[in-house]
């Protein structure tokens, strides 16, 4: 007598294993206990931390701030950047360098007012219960300004941790100046060379009054990053979350670089509509594997990359023609679908209808019986993210769910949307992190493949891709277009896909 299949019990909000190193805070408000914890038994009910950036212009402060916020959000820790420059631009949108001269009384008044407004909004943000960690992004270049911030935060019951980026590497400073003159809102629409000269003059004004953090501020909590992490000085860390931020900072570098992402070539399981497994690539997947080196040359030129794959055959087969060093990571293996491994979505819906529905309702937290959730994948990917931040130019060939999680980290995409992103086969993605956003580019192999994207409630078998052919083989998305389209980048959620793209120089929304 045939036995009924085992019941697949959803574990929608089950926390990760007890040895997981990350705080778990993304629990719906109605299910939160009176005493909040961060998943490690550390009380966070009253935890409010202001990370105060310190340093001269062109030292990567805004890039560091944006990375920290993205990292914390990726780990379900609510965080927000309060950029004093944005407040200042309300009254002075395009100031010249003279505005930052300390002898300019009106400029000094407006800059102090901007700092006041940013700190006030930050305190209100904490009081409204919207987050746990705020980043105050500004030069905060004098001891007097830092002490003022410390006193304001202390009066509001907010811990402070100062993060100073101190850099004397002229090549890196010039690289940052080059980026600022082309991406900073202060110089939008201006001649790049005139913008660079004005920005250098601004730096000189700050250099006149700049005071690095030293023993005079030994009572403060701070992390001092010298020459892009070549030396790190840590003083008076107080709690777990501060140590998590410092751990991340110690793995950062702010040198210009890019990350390339690609799924494996189409697999035989893709053709059959099955999930998981360790299938070989199909004939069309083999064509993509042979085409991939050409796409990489188009996007990277003569640059030497390191290729990371999972340990599964389809990624190793896809990467085998690439003329670079290759490393296989178990952490890059596809999301483990447990007892559903090797099934189609139609079979999962037929055998486990309640569980099929439960996963659609909370795809990020739902864990397959004997398998993983997207949250679990994020946890095992943290070492990968740290290695990516320490490395320079990496090409990752891996799987749909894993790429969704990595892409969400770099683009700051929400947990609600990242599991529903469409990551097409036979496409190379290049991400270039910058201070004011991540530039995304795509190269299309134009080799047919099935679409493995599934909408909520759908159990349809994988079909040939129905997405329109791009006008060219190359698309670019710049940070300025984020406000016009989907903030989650090109890998949009299909429901209400609103992309702002630049296709071969032609803007499209």
Segments predicted by a language model, with ranges:
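NTP-dependent small-molecule kinase module
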Residues: 2-7, 11-13, 21, 40, ...
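Acidic, low-complexity terminal tails and accessory targeting/binding regions
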Residues: 24-25, 37-42, 214, 231-258, ...
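A glycine- and Lys/Arg-enriched "phosphate-lid" helix/loop adjacent to the NTP-binding pocket
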Residues: 97-109, 152-212
């Amino acid at each position: 007598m045939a036995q009924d299949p085992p019941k697949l019990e959803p574990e929608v909000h089950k926390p990760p294993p007890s040895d997981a190193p990350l705080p778990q805070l993304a629990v719906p408000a109605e299910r939160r206990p009176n005493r909040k914890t961060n998943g490690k038994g550390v009380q966070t009910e009253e935890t409010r931390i202001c990370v105060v950036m310190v340093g001269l212009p062109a030292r990567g402060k805004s890039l560091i701030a944006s990375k920290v916020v993205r990292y914390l959000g990726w780990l379900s820790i609510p965080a927000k950047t309060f950029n004093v420059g944005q407040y200042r631009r309300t009254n002075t949108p395009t100031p010249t360098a003279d505005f930052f001269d300390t002898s300019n009384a009106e400029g000094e008044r407006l800059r102090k007012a901007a700092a006041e407004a940013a700190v006030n909004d930050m305190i209100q943000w904490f009081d409204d219960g919207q987050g746990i960690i705020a980043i105050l992004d500004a030069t905060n270049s004098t001891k007097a300004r830092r002490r003022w911030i410390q006193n304001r935060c202390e009066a509001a019951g907010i811990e402070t941790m100062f993060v100073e980026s101190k850099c004397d590497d002229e090549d890196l400073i010039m690289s940052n100046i080059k980026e600022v003159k082309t991406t900073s809102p202060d110089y939008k629409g201006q001649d790049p060379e005139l913008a660079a000269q004005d920005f250098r003059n601004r730096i000189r004004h700050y250099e006149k009054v700049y005071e690095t953090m030293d023993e005079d501020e030994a009572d403060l909590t701070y992390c001092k990053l010298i020459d892009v992490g070549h030396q790190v000085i840590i003083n008076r860390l107080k709690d777990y979350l501060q140590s998590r931020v410092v751990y991340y900072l110690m793995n950062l570098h702010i040198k210009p670089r890019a990350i390339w992402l690609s799924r494996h070539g189409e697999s035989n399981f893709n053709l059959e509509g099955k999930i998981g497994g360790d299938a070989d690539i199909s004939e069309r997947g083999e064509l993509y594997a042979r085409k991939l080196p050409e796409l990489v040359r188009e996007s990277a030129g003569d640059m030497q990359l390191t290729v990371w794959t999972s340990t599964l055959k389809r990624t190793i087969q896809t990467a085998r023609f690439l003329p670079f060093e290759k490393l296989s990571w178990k952490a890059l293996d596809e999301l483990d679908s447990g007892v559903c491994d090797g099934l189609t979505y139609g079979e999962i819906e037929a055998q486990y209808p309640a569980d099929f529905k439960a996963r659609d309702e909370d795809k990020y937290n739902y864990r397959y019986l004997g398998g993983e959730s997207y949250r679990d994948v994020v946890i095992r990917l943290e070492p990968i993210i740290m290695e990516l931040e320490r490395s320079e130019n990496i090409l990752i060939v891996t799987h749909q769910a894993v790429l969704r999680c990595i892409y969400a980290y770099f683009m700051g995409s929400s947990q609600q949307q990242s599991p529903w992103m469409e990551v097409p086969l036979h496409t190379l993605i290049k991400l270039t992190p910058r201070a004011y956003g991540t530039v995304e580019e795509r190269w299309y192999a134009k080799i047919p493949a099935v679409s493995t994207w599934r909408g909520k409630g759908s159990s349809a078998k994988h079909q040939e891709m129905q997405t329109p052919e791009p006008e060219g083989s190359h698309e670019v998305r710049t940070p300025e277009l984020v406000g016009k389209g989907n903030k989650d980048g090109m890998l949009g959620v299909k429901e209400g896909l609103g992309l702002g793209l630049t296709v071969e120089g032609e803007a499209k929304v």
